[in-house]
Structure formats: C-alpha cells, structure tokens
Amino acid sequence: MVNFGSIWGDIASPGVLAYCASKGAVHQITKAMALDHVGDGIRINAVAPGEVNTPMLSSGRPNPPTVAELAHLAHSTIPMRRLAEPEEIANVVAFLVSDAASYITGAIVPVDAGYTAR
C-alpha cells in the first residue's frame, strides 16, 4: 500500500495550515499502519512529493500563482530547478509496490528534487 503524503507533512508553509496538518497525519498513519500490519505481510509506505506540475499547484489558493511565478518558484527554491512531472512520482510508487522494495515498510519517501535535503 502506498499513501500520498507531501513534503509539507514534515515542513510548514504559511497559508496552508490544514494541508500541512493533514499530510503530517498521513505520514503518521502510514508508519502506525506499517507496524500494525508488518506481521500480516502487508507493506505500507508513503510518497511525499514536493511541487508537481499539476493543476493542483494553482488551485485551492486565494491568489493562484501564474506560470511565470511557478517557473520562478522552481528556479529559486527547488535544488533541481524544476517542478516534478506526475510520471516521476508514479515511478516511485511503482517501485514501492514492486518486489524490489520487499524490505521497505513504514517509509515516507520524499520525491522533491532535494528540497528537504537542505
């Protein structure tokens, strides 16, 4: 099982209190469920994406960013200097559900171009 957390589940950002709190809860639920079900042979992990090039980046905000503002965000705050593409997150999910990840459970895997490594 792979849950969807966010880097904002581990770090705070102004104006998105409920989002940060809910993603933090996803991270803790993932860890608790992993321990509860490890004896059942069920692996439970989560991905924690950073900024992903989807409509969500500009929806649900009082003042949605423009394309130019998103480009500036990527170049000024993300170490790899670009937004993630949805396929890049999907690739990590595919790995986590594969046999190659058979010894991984309870992990929160950041997919954030190095954002949380700073």
Predicted regions and their residues:
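Active-site helix of classical SDR
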Residues: 22, 30
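Conserved SDR Rossmann-fold cofactor-binding beta-strand/turn motif
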Residues: 43-49, 53, 97, 110-112
